Amino acid sequence: MTKRHLLSAGDLTRDDATAILDDADRFREALLGREVKKLPTLRGRTIITMFYENSTRTRVSFEVAGKWMSADVINVSASGSSVAKGESLRDTALTLRAAGADALIIRHPASGAAQQLAEWTVEEDGGGPSVINAGDGTHEHPTQALLDALTIRQRLGSVEGKRVVIVGDVLHSRVARSNVTLLHTLGAEVVLVSPPTLLPRGVENWPVTVSYDLDAELPAADAVLMLRVQAERMNGSFFPSAREYSVRYGLSEKRQAMLPDRAIVLHPGPMVRGMEISFPVADSPQSAVLQQVSNGVHVRMAVLFHLLVGADREAINV
């Protein structure tokens, strides 16, 4: 991977994605058994996280990834910075570039914010900090798609040829968009199951099959990715009630029994237990939710490695 930024799952070729997944596994193995989880891979590098939306898993995993690689990790939030005084995102970005950031990791409510950040911070000689999109509005979340693909590969042996059913609020989901792109790149078959009101315009042009019947899709699924209903992004009523949504599109124990024994259940979090997924299903052996969280750290280590170091595999095992 020779790119300086990771803004979209579409930035990744099949070889790029496979190399990142392979290196994520290498980082996991390099850290196994270490009492002190520290590698010198990014010693002397400065990583700044810019989170303008709430986050637990993504923010923590990027911070842990940077620290396990010995980078200096600095957090900037809207409430704790000059953004609260009216400073623009552009001025904040230029300030952080001038301060010597090697990488900027951004989550922002506006779609396209990461692309803008990359354009604003490029220097005259083409240099500048690497920008990683940690979620921009309803647009993209490429590292989530990578960790989901890694989880599928670890549990099922490969991504290619697997049937992945993505269920729920596709309309407002950056996770769904990035997963559709990356899973298609890696050779998976993707099925979207959603109420018609929660499907985006133009979905017929995506490399997916669309279904409105969850029960019909579960028996042939290798993996089921449940999406949270993003009520905070909704201005109107997209379904009659939470109960009605759960009855038609929630993954209950009864529906789980329709899955093949080998199938896995994924969720990007945060989960709304009792709505899109039941308590027992979320905690069942088929659930890979906590494995996704662990993989998030190693995938983000691999992404930082590819953007800031390059192809020196020996740097992983130091």
Swiss-Prot record:
Any one Gene Ontology biological process term?
amino acid metabolic process
Q: Which residues bind L-aspartate?
A: K85, R174, R228
The family line of this record is: Belongs to the aspartate/ornithine carbamoyltransferase superfamily. ATCase family.
Q: In which pathway does it act?
A: Pyrimidine metabolism; UMP biosynthesis via de novo pathway; (S)-dihydroorotate from bicarbonate: step 2/3
| Cellular component terms per the entry's GO annotation | cytosol
Under the heading InterPro entries, the entry gives: Asp/Orn_carbamoyltranf_P-bd, Asp/Orn_carbamoylTrfase, Asp/Orn_carbamoylTrfase_sf, Asp_carbamoyltransf, Asp_carbamoyltransf_Asp/Orn-bd
UniProt xrefs under Pfam families: OTCace, OTCace_N
State whether it acts alone or in a complex, and with which partners, per the record. Answer: Heterododecamer (2C3:3R2) of six catalytic PyrB chains organized as two trimers (C3), and six regulatory PyrI chains organized as three dimers (R2).
Sorted alphabetically, which NCBIfam families does this protein's record hold?
asp_carb_tr, PRK00856.1
Q: Which reaction does it catalyse?
A: carbamoyl phosphate + L-aspartate = N-carbamoyl-L-aspartate + phosphate + H(+)
Q: What is this protein called?
A: Aspartate carbamoyltransferase catalytic subunit
Keywords of this protein's UniProt record, alphabetized? Pyrimidine biosynthesis, Transferase
The enzyme class is: transferase
Q: Does the keyword Transferase belong to this entry? A: yes
Q: What domain of life? A: Bacteria
Annotated carbamoyl phosphate binding sites = R57, T58, R107, H141, Q144, G269, P270
Q: Does the keyword Transferase apply?
A: yes
The EC number(s) this enzyme carries: 2.1.3.2
